[in-house]
């Protein structure tokens, strides 16, 4: 009995993955959605690990992501450590740039919350690109 349930599970995941990899949208709800996202994210990490730099070299290079404008934090004047806020009340980085989160909310690069994407995948369907954005 457990074997048949496991086989059914694997078949549904493989079917969902093959559908997601196509350009068409596929409807995924509940556990199918979660399993598919985990599979997609794990497989992308596996590919990066196999194609990329060995783990030992990655540890030596350290954090490759750096903020564009480093700034010193002042212990004497903590108000200087706060982010700048413009007239609209939105946080801005030094140089008038919007934080990265706000940049991604533009129409061209819209990012939904995980719950919104899960709801969308269940009702309308979603693509591989949508799901891989969660990784």
Curated annotation (Swiss-Prot):
UniProt-listed InterPro entries: Insulin-like, Insulin-like_neuro_ligands, Insulin-like_sf, Insulin_CS
CC per GO annotation: extracellular region
Signal peptide: 1-22
Places the protein is found: Secreted
Propeptide boundaries: 49-114
Entry keyword annotation includes Disulfide bond: yes
Record flagged with keyword Disulfide bond: yes
Disulfide bonds, paired cysteine numbers: 29-122, 41-135, 121-126
PANTHER family reported for this sequence: ILGF DOMAIN-CONTAINING PROTEIN, INSULIN-LIKE PEPTIDE INSL5
Protein task: May have a role in gut contractility or in thymic development and regulation. Activates RXFP4 with high potency and appears to be the endogenous ligand for this receptor.
Family: Belongs to the insulin family.
Name of the protein in question: Insulin-like peptide INSL5
UniProt organism field: Homo sapiens
Gene: INSL5
């Amino acid at each position: 009995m457990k074997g048949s349930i496991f086989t059914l599970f694997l078949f549904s995941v493989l079917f969902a993955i093959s559908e997601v990899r196509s350009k068409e949208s596929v409807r995924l709800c509940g556990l199918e959605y979660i399993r598919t996202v985990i599979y997609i994210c794990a497989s992308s990490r596996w590919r990066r690990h196999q194609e990329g730099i060995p783990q030992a070299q990655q540890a030596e290079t350290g954090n490759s992501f750096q903020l564009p404008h480093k700034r010193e934090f002042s212990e004497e004047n903590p108000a200087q450590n706060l982010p700048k806020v413009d007239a609209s009340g939105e946080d801005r980085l030094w140089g008038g740039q919007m934080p990265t989160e706000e940049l991604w909310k533009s129409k061209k690069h819209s990012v939904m919350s995980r719950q919104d994407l899960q709801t969308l995948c269940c009702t309308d369907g979603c693509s591989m690109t949508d799901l891989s954005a969660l990784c």
